[in-house]
Structure formats: structure tokens, C-alpha cells
Amino acid sequence: VLVTGVTGYIGGRLVPRLLDAGYRVRVLARDKNRLQGRNWINQVEVVEGDVLNYSSLLPALSGVDAAYYMVHSMSSSADFDQRDLQAARNFGEAARANHVGRIIYLGGLGDPNTDLSRHLRSRQQTGAALSEAGVPVTEFRAAIVMGSGSVSFEMIRYLTERVPVMICPRWVFTKVQPIAIKDVLDYLVAALETPESAGKIIEIGGADVLTYGNMMLEYAQVRGL
């Protein structure tokens, strides 16, 4: 099993879950030195490569049964979405060339018929681009992933603890369906053992629909602030 995006929040937590489940894991990294200190580093095969460099993906995907695509740009550059599309197409083509059985991708939850942000629309377009080469893709779509260290959790923690009084921006009233990191990892690992998920888009989320403001209030109550 190949895992990309292992320096990120979710990819780095997916690797030990796969190892615990008994899978042989290979990880792709642009710079393997950035992985030093990870407690799983000696249990995996590390291959250096870049999703924007097609030729570097061929050895990374050689002999792989399934691949996790956990890459998306957090850049605000003018062409980040085009770079994301090119990276996904490179990965899909390299997976096809190596006869990879399936790609598993974690994208973003949102109605494509509404006015999505460029980043969210790009994540959904990435899922489509991955499948263009013909390799079956299991695409999970999640809103915000919550867990200690996640961007969303740390933002809520910081604003609640450091900014007790503020003029609320509009996004505070945005409704979202948060999901715990543990549940996301459960879905990602279970997909390997669920072949019927191939070719499907699966929306995942927690039981509650909340605003960011609701979550900040709940955090404050739990912390006794």
C-alpha cells in the first residue's frame, strides 16, 4: 500500500493505522529527511518523489495494490488549482501504468452546484482527475476533520482561549458537519477491505451539524472558560 501526504495531519496518522492492520506500507515523500523522528519510519519503505513529476511516481507505484492520495494544496497562489489537477492526473496515469488496483482519496464535502470556495472546488475536481486514467477511485468527502493538532481544532482552540471577545466574522455562522480524526481513519482503512467502494463518492461526517460559533462555545464549556 502506498501512502502520499505523510507529512500532513491525516496522512501521518494513517500510516500507523495501516501498519497495525497488518499492511506493508510504502510512503512517498519529496524529502525523506522530513520524516525523521516519526515513530513508524523504520517500519515502512520510503520512496522520494513529487506528484508534479510523473517519472518520479512510476517507481513509487511499482508493485502497489492500492494507493492513498492524501495531497492537496494549501497555497493561495493564482494557479494552485491547476497544479492540483496536474498532480492528480500524473498520479492517476502512473497508477494505471503500474496496474494499481485502486486509489483511495480524501476530498472535501460540499454541494458542487453551490458557490464553493476555490480550494474546496479544487479538491472535488482532484477526485475526478484521479479517475481520468481509469483506475477505480474511492473518494471520501469530509467537511472539517477534528482532532488535537488539526488545523480546524487548533483554530477553534486559539480563538476561544486567546480572543475571548471579538467581532464575529461571517464564517463563524457557517454550518459544518465535523468528523473526528479517528472516524476518518476508520473509513480510510476499511475502504481497503471493501472492494465495492471502488468508483464511489462517499460523504462522511459526524452526527451533528454545527456552526463554528457553536464549536467555540462547546470548547469553552469543556475547558471551563
Task: Name each model feature, range by range.
Residues 190-225:
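Mid/C-terminal beta-alpha module of Rossmann-like enzyme folds, strongest
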